[in-house]
């Protein structure tokens, strides 16, 4: 008797062969037909610089571009898309990502459905390189989803109608620019995310509050150093409509963060303090929840496991992103119906997106009914 995986594989390939795999979306019906090849997985990749629509400033740096590497995995005529985005604090670059990808031999695999074997092999090649591993993970998930003819949110048993509103990020800037950015976002988003962590925090919030009273999330990016002052600021923030705080203090000050979380009237989420699933036990009790970013945790496979582990431990879950194209953002959005908060606006911050994918409609994430991660190259 076939096991479940073999059944799904056979059913998916049978549907493909019959030309029945089709999901409608912005690109219309899609059909994937198996083209006889050598039976091996093939990967190609190329650098792609993301150009930001505005200068992006957080507590520790500013930038106008983000380095990125686009990845494609092909099997028997069907292609899955992935990407690696490398903001400065990840400590990765186009050179390190392409260097890692050049070491990966996917040609040894002839069955894309053996995802655990493939991704475990990729992960074993180095202790780091999270973004590079993520690019392969996303592309493989996209490929397998296409072969099965289903988006991953359906394969995970999630209801797309439960996808949350996404935050839209307002970076640190002058009051004039902050006001301009906020005016652009009003009416399009139900919650905004504000970068804080400098002496201008109060001015930032007060400027935004002259424009809108929508709920706000704040991200200090480790910018606060004194726990008592941080707590005073959090109480002030709560009075001004803030609903959550992300990474208030440096990750090295875990005891101070735990104290802050214990006394805070708002939930405190870990970002820089966590990368992978193995990190969750070490921050238990210090944070109310975790922010899962695919570029840090090596992709969808581990991100989904982290979300379930955090839930089982009674923690809140947030899914976030880097500055990315709609490829990686749509991948992260596949488990957004499972989370408490979503910060999936990275594709909206760039001027040269390569894909059509997840949309924001009336402030809410809208997942395309297309197989895999749901993206179409532009």
Residue ranges and their predicted role:
Residues 49-57:
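Short Pro/Gly-enriched beta-strand edge/turn motifs at strand-loop
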């Amino acid at each position: 008797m076939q096991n479940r995986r073999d059944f799904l594989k056979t059913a998916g390939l049978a549907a493909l062969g019959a030309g029945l795999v089709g999901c409608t979306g912005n690109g219309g019906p899609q059909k994937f037909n198996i083209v006889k090849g050598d039976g091996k997985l093939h990967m190609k990749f190329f650098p792609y610089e993301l150009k930001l629509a505005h200068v992006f400033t957080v507590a520790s740096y500013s930038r106008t571009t983000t380095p990125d590497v686009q990845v494609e995995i092909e099997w028997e005529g069907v292609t899955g898309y992935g990407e690696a985005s490398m903001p400065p604090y990840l400590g990765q670059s186009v050179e390190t990502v392409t260097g890692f990808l050049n070491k990966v031999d996917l040609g040894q695999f002839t069955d894309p459905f053996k995802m655990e074997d493939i991704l475990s092999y990729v992960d074993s090649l180095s202790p780091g390189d999270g973004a590079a591993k993520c690019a392969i993970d996303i592309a493989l998930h996209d490929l397998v989803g296409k072969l099965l003819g289903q988006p991953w949110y359906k394969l995970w048993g999630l209801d797309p109608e439960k996808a949350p509103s996404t935050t839209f990020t307002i970076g640190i800037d002058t009051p004039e620019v902050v006001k301009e950015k906020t005016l652009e976002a009003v009416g399009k988003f139900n919650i905004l995310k504000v970068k804080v962590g400098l002496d201008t925090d109060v001015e930032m919030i007060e400027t935004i509050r002259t424009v809108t009273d929508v709920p706000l999330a704040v991200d200090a990016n480790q910018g606060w150093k004194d726990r008592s002052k941080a707590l005073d600021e959090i109480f002030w923030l709560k009075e001004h409509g803030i609903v959550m705080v992300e990474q208030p203090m440096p990750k090295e000050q875990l005891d101070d963060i735990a104290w802050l979380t214990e006394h805070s009237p708002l939930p405190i989420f870990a970002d820089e303090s966590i990368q992978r699933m193995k990190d969750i036990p070490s921050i238990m009790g210090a944070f109310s929840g975790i922010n899962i970013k695919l570029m840090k945790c090596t992709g969808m496979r581990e991100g989904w496991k982290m979300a379930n582990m955090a839930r089982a431990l009674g923690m809140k879950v947030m899914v976030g992103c880097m500055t990315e194209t709609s490829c990686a953002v749509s991948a992260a959005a596949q488990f957004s119906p499972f989370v408490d908060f979503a910060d999936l606006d990275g594709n909206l911050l760039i001027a040269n997106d390569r894909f059509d994918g997840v949309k924001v409609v009336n402030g809410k994430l809208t997942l395309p009914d297309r197989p895999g991660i749901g993206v179409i190259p532009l």
